[in-house]
Curated annotation (Swiss-Prot):
InterPro entries: CheB-like, CheB_C, CheY-like_superfamily, Sig_transdc_resp-reg_Me-estase, Sig_transdc_resp-reg_receiver. GO terms for molecular function: phosphorelay response regulator activity; protein-glutamate methylesterase activity; protein-glutamine glutaminase activity. In V.cholerae cheB2 is a pseudogene. The keyword Phosphoprotein applies. This is Protein-glutamate methylesterase/protein-glutamine glutaminase 3. It comes from Vibrio cholerae serotype O1 (strain ATCC 39315 / El Tor Inaba N16961). It catalyses: [protein]-L-glutamate 5-O-methyl ester + H2O = L-glutamyl-[protein] + methanol + H(+); L-glutaminyl-[protein] + H2O = L-glutamyl-[protein] + NH4(+).
Length: 358
């Protein structure tokens, strides 16, 4: 496996290279900035690349953009845990980077060893991933400024809810689906995206700027409103519950029983207890692992509606594949088609999610 490490710090390049040397059959080269990286990508043609963001001569985002045009390859961003780092990293994911690792301590090389296993795991996985550049669709400032404001669902006796489970490759996929939903989509939507805390806040803010629907991070107990999108808080789990008889969601401490956080499994299980399977619309999207597969299969078997992203369109197909192994009959599609399916299901059911057989 040919790995290119791109960082303006010689010490950081050495530290990252030493971490990656433990990958079997790894052949590693380094680049000191974006221009050096592009030159080595074209001449050496690496299988995967790690990329810093802040560099002289040519920064990481400019380098990433040019590589995605000239010779796309899987790129893992190394970024800080700051809010600014989260915003820039999200932009990189939209531009085509397949994954990221948040560096503890920012530029402190010594602390990089804390995430050494994660760096190796993500670089190995990235080498097998599909590279996808998400098209940036524009929404006018006027459209965003006058978002569709829906009332709190006070008479929603069946407590109807839509849930998206997503991990690696998720931000662009989620935004594509939400952009293709009508402004009057009548269900609250919870997006469970595996991300650190500072990144989910930046993700929710980005979606809120770019979408017609209001978007909020679940950073406290919130009563769920129709037509509003909710992003689970990173480094926490999220559960669905009732507050004064109204459907609500709230963050909870991580449950060590689950491997990924926020946990799709825990979220969907709580939604089943609170709403019942037949009042749920669940969508499984791109990502590693099998988080939420068992619980979404239970929803499908309990007369709820479950869709999965077509695995061939995923950056990482593991999560949809895990669900399809359990319930192979559920509909699949591209992000755009999933938005169409969600819209049709909700329109046809009018006010109740009783769909019968799939």
């Amino acid at each position: 496996m040919k790995i290119l490490v791109v960082d303006d710090s010689a010490l950081m390049r050495t530290t990252i290279s030493d971490i990656l040397q433990n990958i079997p059959n790894a052949e590693i080269k380094t680049a000191r900035d974006g221009m050096d990286a592009i030159d080595k990508v074209m001449k050496w043609q690496p299988d995967v690349m790690t990329l810093d963001i802040n560099m002289p001569n040519m920064d990481g985002l400019t380098c990433l953009t040019q590589i995605m045009v000239e010779r796309p390859l899987p790129i893992v961003m190394l970024s800080s845990l700051t809010h600014e780092g989260a915003i820039t990293t999200l932009e990189a994911l939209y531009l085509g980077a397949v994954d990221f690792v948040a560096k503890p301590g920012g530029t402190i090389c010594g602390r990089l060893q804390e995430v050494a296993p994660l760096i190796r795991e993500k670089v190995r996985a990235a080498a097998k991933m599909r590279v996808k550049v998400h098209t940036q669709l524009s929404v006018s400032p006027a459209e965003v400024e006058h978002k569709h404001k829906s009332p709190v669902v006070e008479n929603n006796e069946d407590h109807q809810l839509a849930i998206m489970g997503v991990s690696t490759g998720g931000p662009g996929t989620v935004e594509t689906i939400l952009r293709h939903l009508p402004a009057d989509f009548s269900l609250p939507i919870i997006v469970n995206q595996h991300m650190p805390e500072s990144f989910t806040a930046a993700f929710a803010q980005r979606l809120n700027r770019h979408l017609q629907q209001p978007v909020k991070e679940i950073n406290r107990a919130l009563v769920l409103e129709a037509g509003t999108v909710y992003v689970c808080k990173g480094d926490r789990d999220c559960i669905v519950t009732l507050r004064d008889g109204k459907l609500a969601a709230m963050p909870t401490p991580n449950d060590s029983h689950f491997s990924w956080h926020p946990s799709v499994s825990k979220l969907v299980a709580s939604a089943i207890r609170t709403c019942g399977e037949d009042n749920l619309l669940c969508v499984m999207l791109t990502g590693m692992g099998d988080d939420g597969a068992t619980e979404m299969a239970q929803v499908a078997q309990g007369n709820g509606i479950v869709f999965a992203q077509e695995p061939t369109t995923c950056v990482v197909p593991s999560m949809p594949e895990a669900l399809l192994k359990r319930v192979p009959h559920i509909p699949t599609g591209t992000p755009e088609h999933l938005a169409y399916l969600m819209t049709e299901v909700v329109r046809q059911s009018s006010r109740e999610l009783h769909y019968g057989n799939h």
